[in-house]
């Protein structure tokens, strides 16, 4: 098999396997579905590998950690040294529940939740927005970090998966901080903007939803988040595939997402309204501070 493999890119990214989808994508009702789908494995040497021209690769699955680190042992070291020992008991409970789910790979990994919590505390955020919720791991991280009178407006096209995590959020004593809104994100954001009092009301926004709409979400969130506030966008390196010159080796699903992410990255890179940084945490996270 190794003789048939063609290495098309070498870097700190997943080494995906041939796709083995058993559930139609249409059955995944959460907006977080667009974050990932497929069957991937993490290779020691990094890079996307394909077995033949007929075999397509997929970026994410439950079979591999959502990380861009080339070394799995290094990722484990980081988790065991800095993440798990400091993990809130309710965050751990929800993480373990989510990991057993068929689409558990769509969840924000614990190191990303830790980063979000730190950012929220550093910025003193009180009112936040989250687009794309899934089981609520990042919502819980946010609710635990913001003050008792803070709010996270959590938006997802379906509450099916959120209901899996809601009992843990309630047990953590932070359910009163969560304002879950079911439906497509665009009209919900537009409805928020219809009330002028919401412009500049929010301190922080986190987006982990349909990648094709990231640019549109950005325009709306720039009006909802105050000057000096932070906007965070997940999956902006998409398994490292953004660096591919030829994405024909990818599943069509991943090709579409890759192209959307590449366009979004270019948009942020040239946006004078924000100060931005892209970090290789998890699957890539882009942080923007609104300047004007």
From Swiss-Prot:
Annotated tissue distribution: Expressed in stems only.
On the tree of life, the source organism's domain of life is Eukaryota
- Annotated binding of S-adenosyl-L-methionine, by residue: 108, 130, 132-133, 138, 156, 185, 210
GO biological process, alphabetically ordered: methylation
- From what organism does this protein derive? Oryza sativa subsp. japonica
- Which keywords accompany this UniProt record? Magnesium, Metal-binding, Methyltransferase, S-adenosyl-L-methionine, Transferase
PANTHER family on file: O-METHYLTRANSFERASE-RELATED, TRICIN SYNTHASE 2
What is the protein name stated in its UniProt record?
Tricin synthase 2
Where a divalent metal cation binds, per the record, is at 208, 234-235
């Amino acid at each position: 098999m190794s003789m048939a493999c063609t290495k098309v890119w070498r870097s700190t990214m997943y080494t995906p396997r041939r796709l083995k989808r058993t559930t139609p994508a249409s059955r995944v009702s959460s907006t977080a579905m667009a974050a990932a789908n497929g069957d991937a494995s993490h290779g020691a040497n990094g890079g996307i590998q394909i077995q033949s021209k007929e075999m397509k690769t997929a970026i994410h699955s439950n079979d591999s950690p959502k990380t861009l680190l080339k070394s799995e042992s290094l990722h484990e070291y980081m988790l065991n040294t800095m993440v798990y020992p400091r993990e809130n008991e309710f965050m751990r409970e929800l993480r373990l529940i989510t990991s057993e789910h068929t689409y558990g790979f769509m969840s924000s990994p614990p190191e990303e939740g830790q980063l979000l919590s730190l950012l929220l505390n550093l910025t003193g955020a009180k009112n936040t927005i989250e687009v794309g919720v899934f089981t609520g791991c990042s919502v819980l991280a946010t609710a635990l970090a913001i003050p008792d009178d803070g709010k996270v407006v959590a938006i997802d096209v379906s509450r099916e998966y959120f209901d899996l995590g809601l009992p843990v959020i309630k047990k953590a004593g932070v359910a009163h901080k969560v304002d879950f809104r079911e439906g497509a994100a665009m009209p919900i954001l537009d409805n928020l903007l219809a009330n002028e009092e919401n412009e500049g009301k929010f301190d922080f926004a986190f987006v982990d939803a349909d990648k094709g709409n990231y640019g549109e979400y950005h325009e709306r969130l720039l009006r909802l988040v105050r000057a000096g506030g932070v906007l965070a966008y997940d999956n902006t390196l998409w398994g490292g595939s953004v660096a591919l010159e030829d994405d024909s080796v990818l599943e069509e699903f991943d090709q579409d997402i890759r192209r959307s992410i590449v366009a979004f990255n270019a948009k942020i890179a040239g946006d004078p309204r924000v100060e931005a940084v892209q970090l290789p945490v998890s699957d890539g996270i882009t942080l923007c501070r609104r300047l004007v």
